[in-house]
């Protein structure tokens, strides 16, 4: 509605498709390209744009961390993490990709996360008509393979017919496959740390994230994370509201 009110006919168009259609579009000589998506495809876009000397803006995703230290308000953190992560079933570029939490508060955090998932999405999210599905079968299959009996903490139910995967918490390490890609789904790995410096080192061992979130009552820890990590945007004691 906004587009139809704002622009004349012919000024805006939509092309639906996959690799073939995108490849064709990138062969055109545009004045400007704004791209939102994965780093891998962003590299392709930039290379093709360079052939026409077309300027670009690349808003690329990444593994956006959510740090929870021992001083955090755990119930508040859980409420806001569940909202930010599972909005649109995790299919947003600024969703918390994984949790890095102090090992001393992990059990309490998990307990609160489980409670919030039930409160926000019901005891059976797959049957909740307001809970979204995966965008397609390919993404459904990609998410489903990360869930195993060995790493499952909570959730894990999937429904192939509806392409729904319920909000899922996983025990994880940085060596796991789920930590090697941007998740873009309702899978939330949880990794622990001993101190904030270790958490910062782990974040900086990965590519720079699009977003970063920290839940902490310690100004020292907040400043350490914000000053020593590079990221696109983020929040203290909240998630995703920086894009509002």
Residue ranges and their predicted role:
Residues 31-32, 211:
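Short SAM/SAH-binding signature in class I
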Residues 1-20:
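PLP-dependent aminotransferase-like
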Residues 18-21, 62, 194-196:
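Short helix-initiation/N-cap motifs at beta->coil->alpha
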Residues 32, 38-174, 197, 236:
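ALDH superfamily catalytic-core signature
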Residues 15-17, 36, 215:
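Structural motif
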Residues 67, 164-244:
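Conserved C-terminal structural/oligomerization subdomain of aldehyde/semialdehyde dehydrogenase
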Residues 22-23, 42-43, 222:
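Short, well-ordered alpha-helical microsegments
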Residues 26-27, 60-61, 92-94, 127-128, ...:
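Short glycine-enriched loop/turn motifs at secondary-structure junctions
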């Amino acid at each position: 509605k906004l587009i139809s009110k704002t622009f004349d006919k012919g000024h805006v168009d939509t092309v639906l498709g996959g690799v073939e259609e995108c490849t064709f579009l990138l062969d055109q000589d545009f004045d400007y390209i704004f791209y939102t998506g994965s780093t891998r495809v962003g590299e392709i876009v930039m290379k093709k744009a360079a052939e026409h000397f077309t300027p670009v803006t690349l808003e690329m995703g990444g593994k956006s961390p959510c740090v929870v230290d021992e001083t955090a308000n755990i119930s508040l953190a859980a409420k806001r993490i569940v909202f930010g992560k599972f909005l649109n079933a995790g299919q947003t570029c600024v969703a918390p990709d994984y949790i890095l939490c102090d090992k001393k508060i992990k059990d309490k955090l998990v307990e609160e996360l489980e409670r919030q998932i039930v409160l926000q999405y019901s005891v059976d999210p797959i049957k909740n008509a307001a809970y979204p599905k995966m965008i397609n079968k390919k993404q459904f299959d990609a998410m489903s393979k990360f869930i195993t009996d060995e790493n499952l903490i909570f959730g894990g139910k999937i429904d192939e017919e509806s392409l729904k995967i319920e909000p899922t918490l996983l025990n994880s390490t940085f060596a796991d496959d789920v930590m090697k890609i941007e998740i873009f789904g309702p899978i939330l790995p949880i990794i622990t740390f001993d101190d904030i410096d270790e958490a910062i080192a782990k974040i900086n061992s990965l590519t720079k994230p699009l977003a970063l979130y920290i839940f902490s009552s310690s100004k020292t820890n907040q400043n350490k994370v914000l000053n020593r990590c590079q990221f696109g945007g983020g929040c203290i004691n909240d998630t995703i509201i920086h894009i509002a």
